[in-house]
């Protein structure tokens, strides 16, 4: 495998100043510039725009991704659960085709194959999923009274912002998250509107092409954006989350949440920010749901051309259940959150939490980015547990004090060329004295990732 990566580096090396970069959401890419052979810097660039007619609106774009990720975690759940230390590696291969049949019709299909190797614990649905339909949707573009409207039908991903706090594609694990349903995107009077109604896709991994929609986990909503994602914007949204047979506090029942949120992000001079607040109401069985969360990242980029240092402050909080056994559930559900929001380790989830972190990133050279920082985590209320991903109560954590622990994190990313990126993360997490008294261990997590995009 190392020889394959090395060969790819040589084959795909070369300047590509005029070619568009690859995106986390591959269906957002626009490679029409590569219709000109003069802009094709690598052998695979010719696949990005295959003309299907005499005009530029009819073409096929082919692409894919190969990702290798090795990781080691020595104390899952701080050593308080049944699982022990483990180290293993992921292999993910995705291939897609993007057919544009004129200005009004587009079809995007992606096949994904995800494997896990060397894991001692049983593989989960986010670890492995043999060849299956990752994405398959059709876009229909029309204009109504001069305003553009896009209708998207089929299997698709949802992500509305860069941080992806509560709705994310789940890039960190091996199997990305998808939904089956319908989405409408329109613009009118300087506002962008998005409406959707979806069933989550159930990843099965029993055999190839066995994934199905899961009507027991439904997600719908409406978002309204004022401004541009490239500068400053303000979003208001409503989500409806409905899950049959959801687990909470040792019980299982129907869970329905209506989430109302505001999010603002942008840049002003050397300052940047991303701030979000969400309030949830609903029912879990016979209990009423009242929960909340806030997430904030504030950054400052220092002047000067050398190393491009950026200092960021992260302030987050999410409610926990203050009175177990009553008729109200106050534990915040982070819905379809980005698992790597705090770190890639999955040690903590965005529930019953107060997090404060400070991080510094630098770029010693143009392709190399380094980041280092740390923070402190505590439970928002002592009556509720600390939670690991995905919304798993950490055993015996309700016995300890509010303080969960202190962590230090180091990240490195090296962009070899337009196609290949190497990255790593190291985490050192020291549990609080209260958690250590009930048996918690210090946690060390490490990962290395090679990602090849074309």
Predicted feature descriptions by range:
Residues 21-41, 250, 287-398:
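Extracellular/periplasmic loop regions
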Residues 68-74, 111-117, 155-159, 188-190, ...:
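Transmembrane beta-strands of outer-membrane beta-barrel pores
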Residues 72-91, 99-147, 160, 164-169, ...:
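Surface-exposed loop and membrane-interface regions of Gram-negative outer-membrane beta-barrel proteins
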Residues 64, 93-99, 135-140, 182-186, ...:
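Residues on the lipid-exposed face of transmembrane beta-strands in outer-membrane beta-barrel proteins
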Residues 14-86, 125, 302, 307, ...:
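N-terminal periplasmic/intermembrane-space "pro-region" immediately following the signal or transit peptide
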Residues 144-151, 165-325, 398, 404-408, ...:
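Signature for the C-terminal beta-barrel architecture of outer-membrane proteins
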Residues 6-13:
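Bacterial N-terminal signal peptides
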Residues 417-449, 453:
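Predominantly the C-terminal beta-signal and adjacent terminal strand-loop region
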